[in-house]
Design a protein with these regions (language model features):
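Alpha-helical transmembrane segments in multi-pass membrane proteins
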Residues: 1-35
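Alpha-helical transmembrane segments
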Residues: 1-3, 52-57, 128-130
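Alpha-helical membrane-inserting segments
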Residues: 4, 28, 32, 60-68, ...
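Membrane-interface elements of multi-pass transporters and channels
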Residues: 7, 34-35, 39, 67-79, ...
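Non-cytosolic membrane-interface motifs at loop->transmembrane helix junctions
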Residues: 11-18, 78-83, 147-156
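Alpha-helical transmembrane segments of integral membrane proteins, especially early/N-terminal helices
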Residues: 12-23, 49-63, 157
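Juxtamembrane helix-loop-helix connectors linking adjacent transmembrane helices
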Residues: 36-102, 120
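Transmembrane helix-loop-helix hairpins at the membrane interface
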Residues: 88-180
Length: 180
């Protein structure tokens, strides 16, 4: 909430907060779920699948952006606000952080830890649904409807993929890293 809140966002650097959050979440997930990385397979197939998934999501979001802009007056300013967070920052640094830390850390936490453990406790379907809803609610603190809906759609896509193809977790991580 601190990173997105209209009240506090002017007092914190979004990218440093995301970096810190990514380190904490992925570190905690790794401590609580020791050895999770042993099942990762960064094969050529998973790399290609990750790229294809990211491109497919970009297509979905391109269409969604056009439709939302036609339907809602607030859509374009909210989307512009999301991309405006990159202004004044080193594009190389942001690309590095999103590719190698932030995107992968989100998947390690949300799918590799939260969804995996909720699925073990309540079954794969409920694990998917609950994780997707929590992922969306976390983004609601941004007070940005478009960001929250984007998180729900992307979270549902990655969650469904993890639900049915957990052995492709490396591809899911790659897709999130590229999509970011």
């Amino acid at each position: 909430g601190i990173m997105f809140s209209p009240i506090t966002s002017g007092y914190v650097n979004f990218w440093w907060m995301m970096t810190g959050s990514a380190l904490i979440l992925s570190g905690t997930s790794s401590l609580l779920n020791r050895g999770w990385w042993r099942g990762l397979n960064f094969s050529v197939l998973n790399i290609v699948l990750g790229i294809v998934i990211a491109v497919a999501l970009w297509g979905v979001f391109w269409i969604g952006d056009k439709c939302a802009s036609l339907l809602f007056d607030f859509a374009r300013p909210q989307v512009d606000n999301i991309y405006g967070m990159k202004e004044g920052e080193s594009q190389w640094l942001l690309t590095f952080l999103m590719l190698f830390l932030i995107g992968p850390a989100e998947e390690i936490y949300w799918r590799g830890y939260v969804q995996k453990n909720l699925s073990l406790r309540w079954g794969a379907n409920w694990g998917f649904v609950i994780t997707t809803l929590i992922y969306g609610v976390v983004h609601a603190s941004s007070c940005n409807f478009m960001l929250t809906m984007a998180a729900m759609v992307a979270g549902a896509a990655w969650g469904l993929l993890y639900r049915f193809f957990p052995e492709r977790f490396a591809a899911i991580i790659i897709s999130h890293a590229i999509w970011d």
